[in-house]
């Protein structure tokens, strides 16, 4: 049986969300005898050196990744997340280029975005994950737009041949099960590989409320705001 490896994880360096501290993360991964772990903070590599040193010291394989917001038709009002992982040095270099360009050329209302055109120029050594229900394929599936989901998945499969994966997860969010079954059906039809992920923002369930507080501070909302979107689960 293939060992489970976390490929979607935000640390405290994500700034927008995430409470995970590098030292605690590596300790937990080593404790669970997991061979590797990825850190995919939002559009930054701030914690990368600390992550690399701690992982290597513990005998854990570090995987460098990043969550990016991709503009549809260069329109930041129509953007969706995409997770990219570095396979090698070339992939790491390409991810650093994308992050830098997002901040120097892609900022909108103070937030960094990337263009599909930039992705098309930086595919070497990069693995792409669909971000499940939140990604562009997932949103099409949840909207019961099968043809659009097929078109979008086919685009990513062509851009990242044998390196694009549809994510499957059960995080307790609304729509998870609907997306999972639709994604499996789509993957079978396209012969697209799938990967199980868990959208990690904290290490222990009791940290959920603290994480919600952090998110509220960022969004300028209060915990008891009935209009506040609930993006996370315990």
Outline where the language-model segments fall.
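Phosphodiester-processing cores and adjacent nucleic acid-binding clamps
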Residues: 1-234
